[in-house]
């Protein structure tokens, strides 16, 4: 089963487990770098929780996800269509003030991540910002019928080098540690500006 198949099959359960997750600190840190009413690409929108938050704060949001069932959940929640796209199929150009990739790029294989980062770089306006989070670690692993490509401060560096300038990088506790927890039970969070 691929990670996308997992989300398609378990979308309702995933919704219940994540819709009320407290990510206010992440929002606050990210939005410090996003202009008011700016345009945000919610890359890997999942159940739509984050898209709804940004829309309610006055931002223009384009949600995308590789899981058709997640796209349906997001579309129903926010009252507008989310796009059914894999990260590898994102081809926007100079359109976004920011990209929010919360707990989503962690399913992109290491050998494809640089290409996705290049697409994100192209999608952002000059000086646009990227937020991304990964399970904390340094290796690929299988958990709960999904594949995870964990990152730490050193392993993320070559994927953003020459594309993004790190503004903030921090480790945070995994508040849902029973859900495919990393061995370290932590997340790597990155906010970086397009170079």
Regions found by a protein language model. Give the residues of each.
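Acceptor-substrate binding/catalytic loop of class I
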Residues: 139-155, 179-180
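Conserved beta-strand signature within the Rossmann-like core of class I S-adenosyl-L-methionine
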Residues: 127-134
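A short acidic, Gly/Pro-enriched loop at the edge of an enzyme's catalytic core
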Residues: 88-99
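Class I SAM-dependent methyltransferase SAM/SAH-binding core
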Residues: 47-89
């Amino acid at each position: 089963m691929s990670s996308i198949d997992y989300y398609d099959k378990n979308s309702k359960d995933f919704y219940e487990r994540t819709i009320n997750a407290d990510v206010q600190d992440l929002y606050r840190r990210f939005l410090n770098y996003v202009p008011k009413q700016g345009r945000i690409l919610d890359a890997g929108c999942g159940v739509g929780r984050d898209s709804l938050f940004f829309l309610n704060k006055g931002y223009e949001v384009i949600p995308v996800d590789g899981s058709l069932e997640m796209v349906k959940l997001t579309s129903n929640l926010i009252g507008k269509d989310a796009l059914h796209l894999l990260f590898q199929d994102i081809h926007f150009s100079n359109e976004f003030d920011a990209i929010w990739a919360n707990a989503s790029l962690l399913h992109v294989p290491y050998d494809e991540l640089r290409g996705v980062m290049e697409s994100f770089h192209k999608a952002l306006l000059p000086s646009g910002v990227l937020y991304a989070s990964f399970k904390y670690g340094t290796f690929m692993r299988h958990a709960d019928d999904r594949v995870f490509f964990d990152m730490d401060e050193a392993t993320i560096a070559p994927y953003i080098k020459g594309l993004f300038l790190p503004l903030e990088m921090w480790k945070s506790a995994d508040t849902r540690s029973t859900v495919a927890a990393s061995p370290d039970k932590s997340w790597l969070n990155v906010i970086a500006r397009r170079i």
